[in-house]
Amino acid sequence: MTMTANKNSSITHGAGGTKAPRGTLSRSQSVSPPPVLSPPRSPIYPLSDSETSACRYPSHSSSRVLLKDRHPPAPSPQNPQDPSPDTSPPTCPFKTASFGYLDRSPSACKRDAQKESVQGAAQDVAGVAACLPLAQSTPFPGPAAGPRGVLLTRTGTRAHSLGIREKISAWEGRREASPRMSMCGEKREGSGSEWAASEGCPSLGCPSVVPSPCSSEKTFDFKGLRRMSRTFSECSYPETEEEGEALPVRDSFYRLEKRLGRSEPSAFLRGHGSRKESSAVLSRIQKIEQVLKEQPGRGLPQLPSSCYSVDRGKRKTGTLGSLEEPAGGASVSAGSRAVGVAGVAGEAGPPPEREGSGSTKPGTPGNSPSSQRLPSKSSLDPAVNPVPKPKRTFEYEADKNPKSKPSNGLPPSPTPAAPPPLPSTPAPPVTRRPKKDMRGHRKSQSRKSFEFEDASSLQSLYPSSPTENGTENQPKFGSKSTLEENAYEDIVGDLPKENPYEDVDLKSRRAGRKSQQLSENSLDSLHRMWSPQDRKYNSPPTQLSLKPNSQSLRSGNWSERKSHRLPRLPKRHSHDDMLLLAQLSLPSSPSSLNEDSLSTTSELLSSRRARRIPKLVQRINSIYNAKRGKKRLKKLSMSSIETASLRDENSESESDSDDRFKAHTQRLVHIQSMLKRAPSYRTLELELLEWQERELFEYFVVVSLKKKPSRNTYLPEVSYQFPKLDRPTKQMREAEERLKAIPQFCFPDAKDWLPVSEYSSETFSFMLTGEDGSRRFGYCRRLLPSGKGPRLPEVYCVISRLGCFGLFSKVLDEVERRRGISAALVYPFMRSLMESPFPAPGKTIKVKTFLPGAGNEVLELRRPMDSRLEHVDFECLFTCLSVRQLIRIFASLLLERRVIFVADKLSTLSSCSHAVVALLYPFSWQHTFIPVLPASMIDIVCCPTPFLVGLLSSSLPKLKELPVEEALMVNLGSDRFIRQMDDEDTLLPRKLQAALEQALERKNELISQDSDSDSDDECNTLNGLVSEVFIRFFVETVGHYSLFLTQSEKGERAFQREAFRKSVASKSIRRFLEVFMESQMFAGFIQDRELRKCRAKGLFEQRVEQYLEELPDTEQSGMNKFLRGLGNKMKFLHKKN
C-alpha cells in the first residue's frame, strides 16, 4: 500500500515553501545499488489520481496530494526521485530533514538506503530496513517499492521479526531492539491496518519528548500514548489505516539520534517516556490484528478516504446537501484524507524552527497542493464528504500565513454563503493565530483529544476502567465516553471552564492538547448570545452558522447521538431559549414550536441543568398541582389553531353557566372600551433604554411649609432646588409643572400640621405618571430641621426614573447627615451624584465626596438585580386585609379596574399601596398610581381611566359626594369594601384562585417548616413566601408565553396571541386570558420581552424555566380523547335543550 507521511511537516514542493539551496538534497541522498525485491504487487485498493500522481511526480504541486500533512523534506525543487548513481552517501545534514517522512520515492532510493543500512537484509523486510538509515538519507523510503508501490503481504511476517530485531541490534551496536521494534517490523510488512494503528500514537504532543534525527532542536512528545491507543482500539478499521509507521520510525530514530548526537544533550532530556508506554501500543495493535484474524469475512480495512463517504443507507448530512461518489476512484477521498483525516499522527505542538528551514502549513489555502486540488475534485466527484477533521500538526513560524485561517485544511469557500461541507460527526473549526513565542505557538496547534476520528466509533461507549494501560483517567472529565459523546451536544454538568474547547490545561487535561478556538465569527456570536452567568450551559459551538441565513444545524444521526445524553431534558423553553433558536436559524413559526418537533427542538438547545428549587417553592407548587391537576397545555399545530371553532370554547369538562359566560363577555367589552380612553403606555424597558445613558436622578428639592398670611394654615413650597431650571425649553416647562405638583405629594396632609419640638424622621415615596405614561418616582425624607423650640418639618425629595427605594434611601441618609452639619454641604454632594452613571441591574456605582473634618469619602450605591420587594411590607397588608379580600383586590387590579384605598395613617396607605402593586410582579401597573393622594387633588378619582390611589380618612366624606364611576373602594382600617362591583370572586380561574387562597392561608405553616439550606432564607420570610405564591399564579397562567415569541427574518420578535391563549387546556384560564390579554399590563410585559436585548433573568424567568421542565409532554390516547369529546358534545346538547 502506498502511503505518504511527513511527521515533521517540512517544505511542500510548489506550494510556496521556503527554498533552500539546491545542493541540499543531493548531499542527503544515499544511492547504493538496490537489492533484489520481490515482484511488485498492485495495490488492493484503487488509488486515486492524486495518489498516483503523488507517487510518480512528487515535485509537481498541481498533482500532489499530501496525506496527513506530510510533505517532501527536500528544500530544493529538484526531483528527489532522480538521484545520481555516482553520489556517495554523505553524513546526515540534519537541517530540514523530517524524521517521520515516508515518501513514495522510486525503488532506487529505497534499495540504496536499504543496502547502506542493513547489509544482507532479507528482501521482504525492505520497508523496515529502509526506515533505519533515515538519519543519513533525507527522502525516507516508504513501505512500498515501485512507481505504484508494493503492498507487502502479511505472510511470513512473524517469521522474520526475530531476524529484524537481531539486525537492528547489530546495526545499532548497543543492544537488542525492543518488542516495539519487532512489532513495527511485523506491522510494516503486514497489511495496512496492522501497521496503521501504531502510527498516531507517538504523535501526541506531550511532555515526554523524543528527539528528531533531523534536528537536535526538534522534539516530539509521547505522554498521550495510553489515551491514543485506547481511542484507536475502539475505533473502526478505516480510522487506523495510515497510522502505523511513525512509532517504529521514531523509536529507532531515538536510539540513532542518541548515538549520533551525544554532543547535543538538550534534545534527549525527556526521551524515555515512550519506552515506558510501549506495551500500551503493542496491546492495541495486537487487538486489531486479532480482530482481523477472527473476522476474515469483514475483509481488509477500508481506506481512510472512504471512511466519510456518504452512506446512503444511514448517514444524512443536513448542511449543504449530500455528495455522491462515482464508482471509479477515490481522488476526493485522497484529498479528504489529506486535509481531513490528516492529523491523527501529526504533532500536537511545533518544535522550534531551525535557521534555513521552513514549511508551509499543511492545509493552508493557497499553500498546500492538496487544498488546491480539493475544490475541483469535489465538484467532479460529489460522493464523498471531505471531513474537516482537526489536525494535530505543526508548522514553522516563519512560513505561517497569518491571513489564511483554514478550517481543518479545507480551502476557503469562494463566497461566504457556501461554507465547507460538514460531517455527520461534528468537529470544531480550527483557527490558527500567529504566536510570538514557542509556547503560544504550541498551544494554538494543540488539539484536545482524538474523540472525533470516526463517526461510527462514537456510538460505542469507551471502556470505563480507570487504570487501563497503566494510567489513570483525569477525574475532572468523568468518563471518557461522556465527554466525547456529548462534546458537541448539550453540555449539562458544571464544567470548570465556560467553553469546552477553550483553556484546557496542558498537564492535567489531555497533556498539552488544548482545543482549537472557534472561528472568529462563531466565537463572537457565541459571546454575544451568552451572558457570563449563562455560559455554564454551552450551546454546541459548531452549530452556530457563520451566516445567519445558512442552514447550520446538522440533522444527521441526531437520533443515534441523543441516546447517549442525560435523560432529563427540558420539554419546552423559555423566552431566552427562543432567542437562541432564532440565532441558530431554526424555523420559528408557531407550528414548528408547538408540534411534535418541539421535543426535538429542546434537544438542539442547551439542556438546562435542573436548578435546586427551594423547599418553600416546592410546597407552594404542590398546592397548585393538587388543585389544578397535571394537564397544562394542549399540543397544537397552526392548522388546529386557525380552525378552532366556538364549539371548542364549550367543549371542556369545566362547564360554566350561561350567566358566567355573559358576565365574561361584559367584562371583555368593558375593559376594551375603558382602555381605549387610557393614555398610551410606556414600559419600563423602553424608558430605561432611553434613560440609561443619562443622569441618576432628575432633580432634588427641599419642600417646606409656609404659613398663609390670611389663615392659620400652611402651604407646602419648594425652598431649595437642584439643579436650577434656567433654560426656558419645553422640557423645562414640563419640569416646572411637575415641580408645582411635588410639594402636594410631599405634604398631602399640610393643613393638619402645627409646629412641633420633636419628630422622628420618616421615609416614604410616591409615583408621578406623566401624560405620555412615563413614570417618575419621588423618594422623600421628612424630618425636623436643626434648631430649638417648636418648628415645622421639611421634606427632602429626590425625583428619578429609577425605581430603587433602597438606593435612594442611602442617598437620603447622606443628605440628612450633611444637612445636620450645614445646608451648604448638600449641594456639592448632589452635584457629584448627578454626574454618576445610570447603574445597570446588579451593578454598583461609586460617588466620591468631600466632607470637612472627614476628608474624601466614597459612597457605594448598588442597584439590586430585582427590586420587586424593595420598600414592600406585606405584614401591614395582611394586618389590614383578610386573604379573601386581598385576592379580590388582586383580581380587580389584574383587570385594570379603579381601586381606592382609605386609611387613617399616611404610612398605612403608602405601605399597602406599594405592597399591592408588588403582588403584580412580573407585571407592572401601567396607570395612575398615587399611594397618598392630596386632598386638593381628590378630583382625580373621577377620571374614566384605571387608577390606584390612597386617600386619608379625612377625605372620605368628600369622596362619597363625587360622581365616581365603577370602582372598588377599600377601607383598610375595617377590612371591608365601601363600594364594589360584586363580581370580584369570579374574575380569576376558580382552581387557581382556590390554590392561591390555600397557600396564603397556610403562610405561617409554610414558613415555619424547616428549610434545607441557608440559601432558602430569602424565601423563608413573609415577603418571600407571598411573592412566590403570586409568581406561581402567573407561571400557571402565562408561563408558556416564551413558546409563542417568534422572530422574523429582520430579527424582530412578535407574539402569537391567539396561539398562546388557545394552547391552554383549561377553559376558565382561557377565558381569563382573553380579558387579561387586553390589559396594558400584559401588553407592556410582552413589549418588554420583544424589546429585551440582554439575557438577564429575574425570579419569574427562573420559575418559568422550572415550570416548562415540569410540563408533561404526553397527550391523551385516541380512545380517551374520543370518549371525552363525545361526553362533552352530550353536555353541550343538554344545555341547549
Swiss-Prot record:
Tissue specificity of this protein: Widely expressed with the exception of peripheral blood lymphocytes. Isoform 1 is expressed in several epithelial and fibroblast (including tumorigenic) but absent in lymphoid cell lines (at protein level). Isoform 3 is expressed in primary cell or weakly tumorigenic but not in tumorigenic cell lines (at protein level).
Polar residues composition-biased segments: 1-12, 49-64, 456-481, 514-524, 539-558
Modified residues (Phosphoserine): 30, 32, 233, 368, 545, 574, 622
Domain uDENN: 698-846
Any single GO CC term annotated in Swiss-Prot or TrEMBL for this entry: plasma membrane
Residue ranges with Basic and acidic residues bias: 392-402, 495-508
Region Interaction with ABL1, residue ranges: 401-447
Disulphide linkage map: none
Domain dDENN, residue spans: 1003-1096
Record note on modification: Phosphorylated. Phosphorylation decreases ITSN1 binding.
A Pfam family of this chain: dDENN
Protein known as: DENN domain-containing protein 2B
Species per Swiss-Prot/TrEMBL record: Homo sapiens (Human)
